[in-house]
């Protein structure tokens, strides 16, 4: 167990909580906007999803991720269906990730929840019939983003952002 896991993280002030979550939501939204061409549909590599590993280090980031996802999904061709269902997936995944401290396991909730729930929503609301194929495509996209980008982001944040956010030295 490393120093980060041994020490109790101090509570954030309301101002810092709101500012950090605003930044997280804005970065998520910006990444989806810039990479729209690969952020929607069954075959997607939503770069912003790499941030869904952050609750493992910063449980408070659940709010920013949820808001960022909601705002991003309003750009989807699926409209409010995606805004609501995608946001619920992100919220549940972030809450689960916040209790998992090992990065390779912390990346699993967003991968698994999005992989199984989003194709189900497409099946129920849009008549998509290839449920298991869509599960596979979403799984591949999520896994690539979370493990290729999310894990390095986790280690970068652990080294460089944890001391700033929690005002501590490791």
Model segments located where?
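Intrinsically disordered, low-complexity non-transmembrane regions of multi-pass membrane transporters
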Residues: 1-13, 159-170
């Amino acid at each position: 167990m490393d120093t980060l896991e041994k020490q109790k993280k101090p509570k954030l002030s309301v101002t810092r909580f709101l500012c950090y979550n605003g930044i997280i939501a804005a970065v998520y939204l910006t990444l989806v906007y810039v990479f729209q061409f690969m952020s929607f549909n069954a075959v997607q590599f939503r770069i912003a999803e790499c941030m869904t590993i952050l609750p493992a280090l910063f449980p408070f980031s659940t709010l920013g991720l949820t808001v960022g996802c909601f705002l991003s999904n309003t750009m989807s061709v699926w409209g409010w269906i995606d805004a609501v269902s995608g946001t619920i997936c992100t919220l549940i995944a972030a809450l689960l990730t916040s209790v998992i401290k090992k990065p390779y396991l912390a990346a699993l909730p967003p991968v698994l929840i999005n992989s199984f729930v989003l194709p189900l929503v497409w099946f129920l609301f849009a008549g998509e019939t290839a449920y298991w194929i869509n599960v596979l495509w979403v799984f591949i996209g999520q896994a690539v983003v979370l493990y290729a980008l999310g894990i390095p982001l986790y280690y970068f944040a652990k080294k460089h952002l944890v001391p700033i956010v929690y005002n501590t030295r490791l």
